[in-house]
Amino acid sequence: MHHVNVLELPGVRGDGAHDDTAGLQAALDSGAAVIHLPVPSAHYLISRTLVMHSGQALLADRNAVVRLAAHAHAHMLTNADHGALSRGITVQGGIWDGNNAHQTCEYHQNGQNWRVPYDPARYLGVLLQFNRVEDLRISQLTLKDPETFGIQMANIRRFTVEDITFDYNLLRPNMDGVHLHGNCHQGRIANLKGDTNDDVVALNADDGWMFEMSRGPITDIQVDGVWCERGYTAVRLLSDGSPIRRVRVANVFGSFSHLVANLGQYNVHPGEPSEITDLVFDGIFCSRTPVPDNAKSGYIPRYPLFKVAPKTFIRNMQINSFCRTEIVENVAPCIGIGEGARVEHLGISQASVVNLASTPLDFLHNQGSIDSLSLTNVCCRAEGGTPRGMLVRNDGVVAHQQFANVTVANLAEPDREA
């Protein structure tokens, strides 16, 4: 059997009242290569995790809704046998509704106590969870109201996640969009739209405790296209023992209450090294979110847009085509290098920062160590009022620096002392 229309099968009604789980799982277990979910009369209702097999494509019509039943406390979709390797899985289309107002995962039930070991049987509040898959594709779908992450992946090689809309009610903390764990390689994550209540994209080589499906390197990842109106954090790279190498983040748009990029360690494995190599940002058009009326997502103006965490080692970091027009008062610098952090080479080019607020806005604040700093075609200015903010505020060490075509207006002159 090569193609199955689930509405033609017994046990699948799509009326929003009857449980469709058994019928949908029977379709997945039938050996069909393509399982089609047309738009039903209401929505598909599931009470247990649907399990896909190697070589399958689950193709839902764009507006076909799959909803998790109240009090199901289960992930919505995964691959078979996380202990073995699955290959060639495609998920396309649909609106995947985690119905979080009527679920409780252990993370929230225990007062956000995540310091327990990872258990594959534990409900983590995730919508789509995949582990040990080669050639995985997830595209053209909406992720709605998870307890925690929209997509969680570990041990994945050759993958694409693209054309994803996040329709989150922001009811819970830790509501990531696309969350990767260790041993994920050769992936493209693109065209993500909508606000989450934590990281839109998390590349966590080490995660710690409850959520740590795997530990290991993350390499060769492209993130291209993130749009948020009032986001939390666009991209996180977390290394606490395992390296992250060769990552490109491009075309990020919007305002963020927390960070644009959160880079480095989080002390989930104390004493282990945090190392990121060859990191490129290209086309970042972001600012601080104005104070929200209802700050469910938190509001932390003291964080820079780009934060290199203390005790983090970055071998090479490039920021190209960065534009920020800021209206929010009392915000942190654009780029912050934390105490004890080291960046071998930091190159920034084609950057424009305009401060419309009355308070200072520094471009770069270094509290760590930068071996080589290069600024090229950078323009920073503060509109009106007294001179305020600095291009480079250096409270650490800069061994070598080179500036070319740097323009400042109504700021202090560039700090050219190492």
Feature annotation, model-predicted:
Residues M1-A418:
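Extracellular/periplasmic carbohydrate-active domains that bind, remodel
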